[in-house]
UniProtKB/Swiss-Prot annotation:
InterPro entries: ADH-like_C (IPR013149), ADH-like_N (IPR013154), ADH_Zn_CS (IPR002328), GroES-like_sf (IPR011032), L-Threonine_3-DHase (IPR004627), NAD(P)-bd_dom_sf (IPR036291), PKS_ER (IPR020843), Zn_alcohol_dh (IPR050129). Catalyzes the NAD(+)-dependent oxidation of L-threonine to 2-amino-3-ketobutyrate. It catalyses: L-threonine + NAD(+) = (2S)-2-amino-3-oxobutanoate + NADH + H(+). One of its GO terms (biological process) is L-threonine catabolic process to glycine. The lineage of its organism: Bacteria, Pseudomonadati, Pseudomonadota, Betaproteobacteria, Burkholderiales. Pathway: Amino-acid degradation; L-threonine degradation via oxydo-reductase pathway; glycine from L-threonine: step 1/2. GO terms for cellular component: cytoplasm. The active site is at residues 40, 43. GO terms for molecular function: L-threonine 3-dehydrogenase activity; zinc ion binding. This is L-threonine 3-dehydrogenase. It comes from the Bacteria. The keyword ATP-binding does not apply.
């Protein structure tokens, strides 16, 4: 089958032919329709330090997808041939303390599709049926293909009660931008997002941001004054992994505020702990999606009117993957979709 793979320990990916995956007793085989390019895939493309330490070579990658079940293992129940599915990209052990307690997103033995094992940038993907998630007919293939990052945004944004709250999001990548729409959809009052990329900030405005702030030109304190915020933000969502952004977020938080961290800062990042301790801040780390409560919430929000369509900005045939990666690398894109049906 056709697949997009890392064949050499060097930048780039290669469209190649690989063996169609075998289907285990508890697996489903998915014929891929659409995939989306993730920031993780950009790290793999660039072959940065993280990728060099993490990605097996050779291996085809990718983990954001939607497709149709075409084969099932003999032990699979609850699915049928022809079901349209996306899937949870974190494959968990099922036996550790957290898995047994229903907290599979905290499994200490997680294996990542397209990171630690063969991925979805291919004509077919085999995954455990437990990880497959049926997509309702009213949700498009394009939207279903971005459920993985949409889930990251949902898990992060809905970690705390947002109704009537003032929310600060640092980092206007696709996940941060989707978090804007989620926060507004569930009843936040002011949703402010910061970045230095004007293209992405404009996307955030289209998704409903109260203010989208280029911090290279505008003061967050001035924006807060314009919004008549006298006490600080109630909820902070750090999506960038940039130390200066995290610092500014902590400074802007109200006493008793709650902070969710999805962005990954450098390991030795220093912060002013006075901001955390004396403000009584609650900080929560976010990894992946809650299985499968996050997935149900994603579907429910889309069915109740959440509009994510502006975040999908580019579409290419899978054979034109280089154009898709170029769009992502340019910094002037939202989500980029690759079509495996043409």
């Amino acid at each position: 089958m056709k697949a997009l793979a890392k064949l050499e320990r060097a930048p780039g990916l290669t469209l190649t032919r690989v063996k169609r995956p075998e289907v285990g007793h508890n697996d489903v085989l998915i014929k891929i329709r659409r995939t989306a390019i993730c920031g993780t895939d950009i790290h793999i493309w660039k072959w940065d330090d993280w990728a060099q330490k993490t990605i097996p070579v050779p291996m085809h990658v990718g983990h954001e997808y939607v497709g149709e079940i075409v084969e099932m293992g003999q032990e699979v129940r609850g699915f049928a041939i022809g079901d349209r599915v996306s899937g949870e990209g974190h494959i968990t052990c099922g036996f550790c303390r957290n898995c047994r307690a229903g907290r599979r997103h905290l499994c200490r033995n997680t294996v990542g599709v397209g990171v630690n094992r063969e991925g979805a940038f291919a004509e077919y993907l085999a995954i455990p049926a437990f990880n497959a998630f049926k997509i309702p007919p009213e949700i498009s293939d394009d939207l279903a293909s971005i459920f993985d990052p949409f889930g990251n945004a949902t898990h992060t944004a809905l970690s705390f009660n947002l109704v009537g709250e003032d929310v600060l999001i640092t980092g206007a990548g696709p996940i941060g931008i989707m978090a804007v729409a989620i926060a507004k959809h569930v009843g936040a009052r002011n949703v402010v997002i910061t970045d230095i990329n004007d293209y992405r900030l404009e996307l955030a405005r289209k998704m409903g941001a109260t203010r989208a702030v280029n911090v290279a030109r505008e003061s967050l304190r001035d924006v807060m004054a314009d919004l008549r915020m006298t006490e600080g933000f109630d909820v902070g969502l750090e999506m960038s992994g940039v130390p200066s952004a995290f610092t500014s977020l902590l400074e802007a938080m109200n006493h008793g505020g709650k902070v969710a961290l999805l962005g990954i800062p450098p390991a030795q990042t220093a912060i002013d702990w006075n901001q955390v301790i004396f403000k009584g801040l609650e900080i929560k780390g976010i990894y992946g999606r809650e299985m499968f409560e996050t997935w149900y919430k994603m579907v429910a929000m889309l069915q109740s009117g959440l509009d994510l369509s502006p975040i999908i900005t580019h579409r290419f045939a899978a054979d034109d993957y280089e154009k898709g990666f170029a769009a992502m690398l340019s910094g002037e894109s939202g989500k980029v979709i690759l079509d495996w049906t043409v």
